[in-house]
Regions:
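A domain-level signal for caspase-like cysteine endopeptidase catalytic cores
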Residues: 2-102
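Short, basic/hydrophobic alpha-helical segments
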Residues: 42-51, 104-107, 142-156
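Short aromatic-enriched loop/helix-cap "lid" or pocket-rim segments at secondary-structure transitions
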Residues: 73-74, 129, 199-200
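Catalytic cores of nucleophile-dependent amide-cleaving enzymes
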Residues: 112-197
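Structured partner-binding subdomains within large eukaryotic complex subunits
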Residues: 188-189, 209-211
Length: 211
């Protein structure tokens, strides 16, 4: 008897938003005027995957503390909103309270055929927390030097498609991802802009998409 085929998984990771009260102090360089930038980008991605394969297995990993804090700030239950969104799209929601938990969730989703990251980043790290615990700083991140320790290479399919919609990923982290996991990680060389998600489109990069 042939062994049963192992169902592949599409993984979407959503980082956290900043506190609006802190970001307003930064004037024209403020981030995250809308709490749902990364959530909306995730649902656009989910819909895109399901349009191609209605039965696709999708795991949505969301950094929870930021949405709890932003929700308290604005008097809204954003955690419930995200939970209801996951139910609507019939995807598996995995809450992560730390960067390490988020990475473990990716490893458990094996075999991963695609990985999408929506959130803040620098050239060297994906920042699941940004300007939420500390203004203009991160307390939970996935640094490029830790990729090989945080992610299992075997968790990804040999031809897995990986892309980061964070800022500046293409300048360094893409190369580190390739070195550690043997897979291309598409990333932009400049900032990424999330205003297109309001029109149902993926975020745009101000620079070149490279891997």
């Amino acid at each position: 008897m042939a062994a049963p085929l192992c169902r592949s998984t599409e993984v979407i990771m959503a980082g956290g938003v900043a506190l609006k009260s802190w970001e307003h102090l930064r004037g024209p360089v403020a981030h995250d005027n809308w709490w749902a930038n990364f959530v909306r980008a995730s649902t656009i991605c989910i819909a895109s995957i399901q349009a191609k394969d209605p039965k696709a297995s999708i795991v949505w990993i969301v950094y929870r503390p930021a949405y709890i804090a932003r929700g308290k700030e604005e008097g809204k239950d954003y955690v419930r909103n995200i939970r209801e969104t996951a139910t609507k799209y019939k995807v598996k929601l995995v809450w992560a309270d730390t960067a390490e938990q988020a990475c473990r969730a990716v490893n458990k989703a094996a075999p991963v055929t695609s990985f999408y990251y929506f959130g803040h980043s620098t050239a060297h790290a994906m920042m699941l927390d940004y300007s939420n615990d500390i203004i203009a700083a991160s307390t939970q991140w996935i640094h490029e030097k830790d990729i090989g320790q945080l992610f299992r290479k075997e968790a990804f399919a040999p031809n897995a498609y990986c892309i980061s919609y964070g800022c500046y990923t293409g300048n360094s982290m893409s190369a580190s991802w390739q070195k550690a996991l043997g897979l291309p990680l598409w990333g932009n060389t400049e900032s990424t802009r999330y205003y297109p998600v309001g029109d149902g489109k993926f975020p745009e990069g101000a620079g070149k998409w490279v891997h």
